[in-house]
C-alpha cells in the first residue's frame, strides 16, 4: 500500500520515537539515493498524486526482516518488485490504484500482477484478488492477469477472465532476457 510521509511519521511516533515529518522525508530520500529503496508510481493517478504517493520497496528483501516480525508476504511482494524492475526498469513498472488495487502493472506488456502467499485454499483472498482483475478490465480490457504465490499453481477463470496462478520460484525461472541498456 502506498505510504505517505505523514503516515510513516505517525507510525514511528506511535512506536515511541520522537521524529518530525521533514526528518522522515530526509531519511527516505537518503535511502532512495543510496539505492536501499526504490519507488513505484501509480499508473492510474494524475501527475501530482503520482509524485506524492509512491509505493516503496527495498532493494534487499532481508531489510524487511529487520523491521517486520511476520514478513513473508511483504518479502514476496518485494521480491516480485525487484524482479520486475530487473526485467523492465523502474520507469516501466507501476502499481495501479483507481477504485482498483493491482500490486504491479507493466503497460508495455499489459501485464497485471497480484502477489499473495496463497489463494487456492483461502476463498476470501482468492475472491479479493480476482475481483480486482475484473475491475481492472474496465480500464484495460486486454490485460494479462497473473497471481504470484509462494507455491501454488493453477489457472482460474473469473468474470470471463483467465488468471494464471504461478509460484514465485517458477515465475523467477521463466525470467526473460534482460534488455540491453
Protein language model features and the residues they cover:
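Accessory nucleic acid-recognition modules appended to NTPase machines
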Residues: 1-112, 117
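Conserved beta-strand termini and adjacent loop/short-helix elements that scaffold enzyme active sites
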Residues: 40, 96-98, 148-150, 166-168
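Catalytic cores of nucleic-acid endonucleases
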Residues: 117-163
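Generic alpha-helical secondary structure signal
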Residues: 6, 22, 74, 124-127, ...
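Residues immediately flanking
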Residues: 61, 115, 150-151, 168
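Domain-level recognition of nuclease-like catalytic cores that cleave nucleotide substrates
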Residues: 151-181
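Generic recognition of well-ordered alpha-helical segments
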Residues: 83, 132-135, 168-171
